[in-house]
Every structure is written in structure tokens, then in C-alpha cells.
């Protein structure tokens, strides 16, 4: 009877010793998995940034070589067109000079983006921006229509055929930002002329997974 009781106690002690050890093991495995995921995400981010830097340099070089008069953000490669060159006040109809500018710029831009980096470019975004005059909803509608007007021309027959046009048509989207991203001076005052603009930018994804 005593022997049986001792065996029972020993089994309970073994179980009580087992669970803390098992829990520690699970915690260790979980920590390793978390560290691996963090490391992998960091590596992916680094690779994507490297690709983006290469694209930025290529785009800047292309614009310089072809004397295309647009602004480019040195940090992220965003290309900016001022409102005055593209639209009349309160209008979303593209000016003829805007069409001529896009007819020169877009073929060069598409070739630069897709020739060496096409498999990693997941999206081309055309954004319309306004100043803070008027209601947010009015500006949202205007900025969206302006972005769509640019996209519609870029993929239209009117602009003509150019290399990678089909690929660009698959990837391009139009977004209206309203007055959400106005440009401000050092004192924090809104620069309305600069805020009214259209931007063309790209997104990089080395996994090449398109957003739904």
C-alpha cells in the first residue's frame, strides 16, 4: 500500500516537473518563430527599398536625358505635375499641352520602370490633390476625376502605342486625395498653388502579389 502510494506521488511529481519544462520549450519555439518572422520582414523591406532606390535613379536619369520638365521627389521617386499645366480652374478635362507632355513622359517612364524592374513593380498610382479651398467632398470629387482623366488618357488609343502599355494598363489606378495632403511651407502655411497637383508614383513588392 505504501509502495503504491509512493509510486502515485512520484508520478505526480514527474507530471508537475514535465509541464513547466514543456511550457518553457513552447515559449522558446514561439520566440524563435517570432524572431525569424521579424528578420524575414526586415530583409524583405531592405530588398524592396534597394529596388526602389535603383528605380528612382533610373527615372531621374531618364527625365534628365530627355529634358522632360517635371518634378521628381529625390527620396521616393514620385513625379509631380502642377495643376496649371494639366487643368483649368475647377476643371478635370486635360489640357492639350498636358496630353503632349504625357505623350512624351509616359512611354519613357513605363520603359524605365518595367524594363529592369517590372517583376517587382506591383502598382502604378496616379493621385489627384487639391488645396483647402472649398469643401472636402467637393475637392475629393474633383481630385478623383482629375486622377481618372490622367489615367484614362495614359491607357487610351489617343496617346498611341508604346512599350509596356499593356502592363501599365494592368497596374495603374486612380486615387483622389482631396485636401488630405496639402503642401506646407516651413511656417506650416498651406501653399495652395503647389498643393493643386497630380502625382504619379509606383509601389514595389518583391513577392509580386497584387492587391485585390
What do the PLM-derived regions correspond to, one by one?
Residues 1-55:
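Short terminal targeting/anchoring segments
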Residues 47-70:
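N-proximal, solvent-exposed amphipathic alpha-helical segments enriched in charged/polar residues
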Residues 51, 90-101, 118, 134, ...:
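Extracytoplasmic/periplasmic, Sec-exported soluble proteins
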Residues 52-54, 102-107, 148-151:
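Well-ordered, non-membrane alpha-helical segments in soluble/globular domains
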Residues 59-63, 72, 87, 91-125, ...:
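Periplasmic peptidoglycan-binding/anchoring modules of Gram-negative envelope and division proteins
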Residues 74, 81-85, 128-130, 204:
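Short, small-residue-rich loop/turn micro-motifs
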Residues 75-77, 81-83, 90, 120-122, ...:
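Envelope-exposed proteins and targeting segments
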Residues 127-207:
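Periplasmic OmpA-like peptidoglycan-binding domain that tethers envelope proteins to the cell wall
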Amino acid at each position: 500500500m505504501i509502495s503504491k502510494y509512493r509510486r502515485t506521488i512520484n508520478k505526480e511529481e514527474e507530471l508537475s516537473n514535465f509541464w513547466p519544462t514543456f511550457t518553457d520549450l513552447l515559449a522558446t519555439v514561439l520566440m524563435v518563430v517570432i524572431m525569424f518572422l521579424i528578420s524575414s520582414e526586415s530583409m524583405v523591406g531592405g530588398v524592396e527599398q534597394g529596388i526602389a532606390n535603383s528605380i528612382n535613379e533610373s527615372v531621374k536619369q531618364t527625365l534628365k536625358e530627355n529634358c522632360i520638365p517635371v518634378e521628381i521627389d529625390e527620396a521616393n521617386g514620385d513625379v509631380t505635375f502642377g495643376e496649371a499645366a494639366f487643368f483649368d480652374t475647377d476643371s478635370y478635362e486635360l489640357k492639350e499641352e498636358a496630353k503632349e507632355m504625357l505623350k512624351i513622359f509616359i512611354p519613357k517612364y513605363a520603359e524605365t520602370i518595367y524594363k529592369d524592374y517590372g517583376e517587382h513593380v506591383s502598382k502604378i498610382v496616379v493621385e489627384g490633390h487639391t488645396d483647402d479651398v472649398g469643401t472636402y467632398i467637393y475637392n475629393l470629387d474633383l481630385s478623383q476625376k482629375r486622377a481618372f482623366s490622367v489615367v484614362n488618357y495614359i491607357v487610351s488609343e489617343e496617346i498611341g502605342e508604346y512599350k509596356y502599355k499593356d502592363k501599365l494598363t494592368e497596374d495603374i489606378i486612380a486615387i483622389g486625395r482631396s485636401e488630405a495632403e496639402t503642401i506646407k511651407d516651413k511656417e506650416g502655411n498651406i501653399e495652395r498653388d503647389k498643393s493643386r497637383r497630380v502625382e504619379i508614383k509606383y509601389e514595389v513588392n518583391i513577392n509580386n502579389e497584387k492587391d485585390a
